Each structure stands twice: as C-alpha cells, then as structure tokens.
Amino acid sequence: MRRPNLKWIVKASLLLLISLTLFVLITSWISSTPYTNKPVHHGVEPVPEKAGLSGDVKVKVPAIKQPEPQKPQEPDFEEDPELQKIDEPEPVEEEVDNPHPADDEPQQQPQEELQMAAPADASVKKDWHDYTFMEKDAKRVGLGEGGKASTLDDESQRDLEKRMSLENGFNALLSDSISVNRSVPDIRHPLCRKKEYVAKLPTVSVIIIFYNEYLSVLMRSVHSLINRSPPELMKEIILVDDHSDREYLGKELETYIAEHFKWVRVVRLPRRTGLIGARAAGARNATAEVLIFLDSHVEANYNWLPPLLEPIALNKRTAVCPFIDVIDHTNFHYRAQDEGARGAFDWEFFYKRLPLLPEDLKHPADPFKSPIMAGGLFAISREFFWELGGYDEGLDIWGGEQYELSFKIWMCGGEMYDAPCSRIGHIYRGPRNHQPSPRKGDYLHKNYKRVAEVWMDEYKNYLYSHGDGLYESVDPGDLTEQKAIRTKLNCKSFKWFMEEVAFDLMKTYPPVDPPSYAMGALQNVGNQNLCLDTLGRKKHNKMGMYACADNIKTPQRTQFWELSWKRDLRLRRKKECLDVQIWDANAPVWLWDCHSQGGNQYWYYDYRHKQLKHGTEGRRCLELLPFSQEVVANKCDTDNRFQQWNFGSFNKTALDNYSQDLVLSL
C-alpha cells in the first residue's frame, strides 16, 4: 500500500484554507456595502441643461421658462394638500348628458371598512423647515422672483398679451417669462417660523383638477409644491384632466412630467364631469393617508405642509384649510389677502366670513376652528373622507360641495380648522372670454337643494325663501344614499351646528334683513342739482355725480343708496358698496363688492351735520370736489357744504343707537 504524499496533503490543505478565508472576507464585504447604482431622486429630478418644453408662445403650445436644476430629494417621496375671493370652478364648454364617471374611467374604489390610524405622539416634535432650500431661494434673481409684480417691456406684444389674458383670465404671456421655480415672499406670521410640529406626519396625495389650464401656470403649481414639501411626506401628485381640449395638455404635458418629475401622474377623464366628479375620481385614485385638494393655479409657500397635517395627525376626523394668498392675475404679484376669518354662508348660499374670536386673536400662529370651508384648498384624512361618503356625486359640475362637506364634517363627529402657518398663493382670475355653460337647466340650485334637503333640516326654508321661487321647480334627485349616510353615522342636527359651531352666523347674516338706517338718493348740499351716481359703471369703478332724480326718496337705481344694517353704504338690493382703499387726502371712492366686515366699507350718517362719515373713528367724510365733480373722502369739516348730504329718508332713532350691537329676534 502506497504511503500518502504528505507534501501534497499539506499544500492542498493550505490552498483550501486560503480559499475559505477569501470567501468569508468577500462575503462579509458584500453584505456591509450598500447597493450604489445611480441614485434615485423622487419628485423633481435634476434637469439637463436644455430639458423641458420650449416653443413660441404665438403657436398653440406655450413656452415654459426653463426650470433650474432642483435639490436632490430623499427616497420614499410622499405628498399632501381656499375666503370670500376663492373663485368658483370655471364653467366649461362641452355639453354632456351623464355627469358621473364612465365605466372606463380609471378608478380606485375605497375599502368598505376603513380603520383609523392611531393618533401621532404630540410630545415628539421637530423643525420641518428646509433652511438650505430657503437660503437658496432667497438668492434667486429674475422676473417675478420673491413674488414681485412683473411686466413685459415689449410693446409689440401688447395685443398678444391682451388676447392671451382674455383666453385664460390671467396674464399667460407674462407667466411664460417667469420661472416655474420662482421664489415667493415668506409672509407668514413671525411665530410660524419658530414652530415645530409632530415628528411623525402622515403621507399625502395632492389632487389637482384642471380643465384647459395654461401650461406654465399648471407646472408652476406642481414645481412649487414639490420644491417646498418634505419629500418623505409627498407620496404623489395626481393631476386630473377633466377632458381638456387644448393640444399642449396632451402629449406635451406628459413629456414634461416624464422628464422632470416622479410620483406625478395624470388621470384622464373620458368625458367632462365638472369639479365635483373630477375630484371624486382623483380621490379614488389616491393612495396616501391624507388627501389634499388644490386648484390648478397656485403656489405653495414655505413649510406649508406640516401645519396643514399636524391637526390631522392628532385627530384623523379633522379637515384643515390653508390661508389663501393672492397672486395678481395681471402681474403675478404674490401678497397676503388678510390674516384670517372664519368661513360662513348667507341665505343665498354665497360664501361669507365671520370675524376671528378673541381667543383666536391671542394665538395668531395656531389653527382656529372654522364652520365652513371655501372649498378650493383643503386637507382631509382619506379614511375620514370615505367614511363620510366622499363627495355627493349627485352634485353636478360645481356649487354646494363645500357646504355639503363642511356640514358632514362637523355634524358627523369631525372638526375643521384654518391653519395660519400654511399659506398658498392663488390666482383669482380677471376678465375672461365667455365660457358656455356645460349643462342645460339649473344645476346650481339643484345642488343647493340636495344639500339643504339632506343636511339643513328646518333651516332649509330660510334658503328657499331667498330663491325667488327657483327651488320650487327644482328636483334634487334621489337622496336615499345621502340620507342613509347621515343615519348610519348618527350625525347631529343642523340646529346643533348653528348653535354650537356657527353660533354667530344668524346675527351676522340674518335670514331676514333688518330695516336699513337710511335710503334714497344722496343729494349734495353744496350743489343741490347733483346726486351721488354710479354713472352706469359696474363695480370696481370710481363713483361720480349726476343730475338728481325728481324724487330723492325713490330715485332711479343708479342713485338709490341704502345705509344697511351691516353699516355699509350700498346700492339698494345689491351687494355693491362704497369702498375707500387709501387713507390719503382726496381718497377716491369706489364701488366694490360688499364684504360686510366694516373696515374700509364702514359708513355712518350724522344727520345733525348731514355728513357721511367713513370708518369707525369718523374722521373722514364723503366730499364732492366742486370743480372736478369727483367724489372723495377727506378729513371731516362741518363748515364744508360739499361734505354735507341730504339722504332721501333716514331713521333718527336707529341712527342714535348706531354703535349698539343688533339684537335680532329670529
């Protein structure tokens, strides 16, 4: 028998030992090294030098100013989401017979039973500001940066500028020259910049409905949301195309989105459904914890998202609305609208506002309760939204949906807030070419009657009494499903809502107007041939003087004024008031939309001196400038006969008690 070759055995053993050692080392190195292929950016991707849409604004596809490279985003990008002035959805052009989504419409149905997530830990907070991005934004220069007013210098394009403005309701040509990534002014209350919010916030799906929106404005909306949102919160932005027919909103839009964004997607509706149906379609396609509904012509301000989400993180049965700033439709100037008010309605279902409560004024950076949302911009838990039944899709096109949802939220176990530290700019459209109605028949009053019949109980009769008989002939449709939701959720009565939530609405907007303090023509004592007159001008114009009517107690409508119980001076049976907008000498007097908040529309008739005093301090008076025949507000002077006015008729007793609060017996 051959003896083993010891030398060979030793060599083989050493070779095997070395191989095993190398295998262990390599395996250990691989397991400790992350996969580092091309980094994934969620949201806006860094843009190549010449990427994006381009083209001549004179052709059908508008140009978009080249986006600058964006900050890299963190993995797991997620998302989220307006006032007297919030514009109601634009009427649309196409006639359709079926307002509801088609069978082939992309949909994601909600679960039958949705479980509420546990509230967030309110004790663990963090600063959500992106200071690096804010510092970078502050250094930007260019047209419209910092939200500043801008103009185009090329006189040769004035006709094109005007034509495009009338097509869109804003200066679309100027929009193409302003960066889609432009900076905005940080106009939050100083306390907002110091606030921290809970460290664990829910993810969001932002839902934006658009119909024939101008491309650069739509994309600026999307860029601003992504630029100023924490990437870990922004899960998706869903753009719901409500059957637009502008060519550039087709393939060009999808190409732009593919080149610049991730987690932004377009849902196309096969037919025109209107705002309510389109929002419902967007909600069905959403997958995040919170739904944020926004208009398609907005710009988000800094750190807008955490203050909108924290109340929902602490209580899932909560809806939250941001403060809505104004983006001027002519020059894109970004400015504050006001510092807040509580949403309400009058008995014609116009959206109105109530003053902030004293406790709210003490905490200007904290969310405050609001009875009614404006409807254009708000956030709500997806679970709670579907628990409430979502939107009533029996409501057609637009109108009444904000009241229906507000009533459901409050009466069915939820609450609603406005968040002062969450600010979003909104373009309020100016003059625009006529937009034909999408429906035959009165869909607006049908919507209102659906809301009233389901939710308003005996108070619905106040609404109907202001309808001039319109509600009598309106069929609200089948209300079985909506009434079943109210029963299933054991919702409270509308009387409870009016007494506990909107407790001051009946006083501010009574169903039956109290008598006016004075009414008739305003005849100038200095020149008794002349009376205050609109001169046939519509609102948003200066007032003037014209030959007085034969009977100043019952003059023609252009001279028929009333000092209403709201302490404003308005055209008889109109919602157009005398408004003074500056405090200089010879301040012009305008005819403006009545806002019922006093301030620059507060007037008092001092019948002893025959003076119309402006403002609660009564230091300025209405005056006729005799040579130019202009109507202005100046410092009161009892010896100036051109500051003296004969009112057609007035109630002395009521005027003597003018400063007292009205006590209404309703």
Swiss-Prot record:
Disruption phenotype: RNAi-mediated knockdown reduces viability. GO terms for biological process: protein O-linked glycosylation. Mn(2+) binds at D295, H297, H426. Residues 107-120 have a biased composition (Low complexity). Substrate binds at D242, R272, S296, W398, R429. It comes from Drosophila melanogaster. Its EC number is 2.4.1.41. Residues 367-429 are annotated as: Catalytic subdomain B. This is N-acetylgalactosaminyltransferase 6. Disulfide bonds join C192-C421, C412-C491, C531-C548, C577-C594, C621-C636. Residues 32-666 are lumenal. It is a single-pass type II membrane protein. The chain crosses the membrane at residues 12-31. Belongs to the glycosyltransferase 2 family. GalNAc-T subfamily. Residues 201-311 are annotated as: Catalytic subdomain A. Its cofactor is Mn(2+). CDD domains: beta-trefoil_Ricin_Pgant9-like, pp-GalNAc-T.
